């Protein structure tokens, strides 16, 4: 509903235009006046309800002052009171000292990778609000309950494709800062949209940890994964197939290429990439193996033998790639979504140095993922072709 021009003219009369949006300006005055108007209307309604229910007579009993934090300022409100003490306003509850948008603003800044000290400085510089680090931490800690609910939410029965990947995060643990792996599972649903299944901070080494993750996915309702794309970690494929025996485990081709280039001097990387392309672009597994042998015997394979050794170690989980038609291969190979996701996560943790504990790391990473979720609501163009091929290859499993 538009505000009448005459009313706006009255509000602006005699005011310096440059101060309208500043601290203690017209906007803050309006917030205060509207808030107090709402509080008085709430008390009137509360008293009317009590009278209609035949409750003992209750009436207004003066007011009290309360200083509250809004999203942009600090404001002292006159809170009306009732004699019986039964009035608890909805706008700003009895023991509440912050408007919800204030908490939302802090959480939004935290999700963008700002540290507690940076948020404190930002609120002071922009809004003139002095907020303690403890209060900021208390606000962001509210997210932990949402993290627990999200991490334990029910899953779909079947996911056509799940990418399992990891980033390294520095976390203080038992007095030492450790470089821990944080695993993320990005799933592609039958309609081509994406969903993060969960986040897990590595607590133990190897297969036992991954087996626990797989069992957790199953206990949350996931009964089948058609293709799992992993980054070549030893023991991970066995953990997946122990819980999901029908799952095809595929080594991530992009990770394998990157690992190969770690052995190559910078000036040689550009010509090595097309030489490797002949392997994973081969028409089938037999042709792929011949291309690997040709690379191994060629100039680059002789100069960097560790590359072909790496491909041979992972060959068992490279082979499934060749059995898929081009549409499915493209979806498996195109890791834009997981790469973009990891980029957001790394950017958020980079400014932190290290986290004081696992909960602090989970809190931030969850918020980053939550902000990115809007981008996954549309299926990529490639999914139209891939979906048909998934349905042909996997039949009824795809439609579960």
Swiss-Prot record:
MF GO annotations: DNA binding; transposase activity
Keyword Ligase among UniProt keywords: no
Claim: rRNA-binding is one of the keywords in the record: no
Alphabetical list of PROSITE patterns matching this protein: TRANSPOSASE_MUTATOR
GO annotation terms (biological process): DNA transposition
InterPro entries referenced in this protein's UniProt entry, alphabetically: Transposase_mutator
Keywords recorded for this protein, A-Z: DNA recombination, DNA-binding, Plasmid, Transposable element, Transposition
Pfam family name, one: Transposase_mut
Family: Belongs to the transposase mutator family.
Purpose of the protein: Required for the transposition of the insertion element.
NCBIfam families listed in its UniProt record: transpos_IS256
Protein's recorded name: Probable transposase for insertion sequence element ISRM3-like
Organism: Sinorhizobium fredii (strain NBRC 101917 / NGR234)
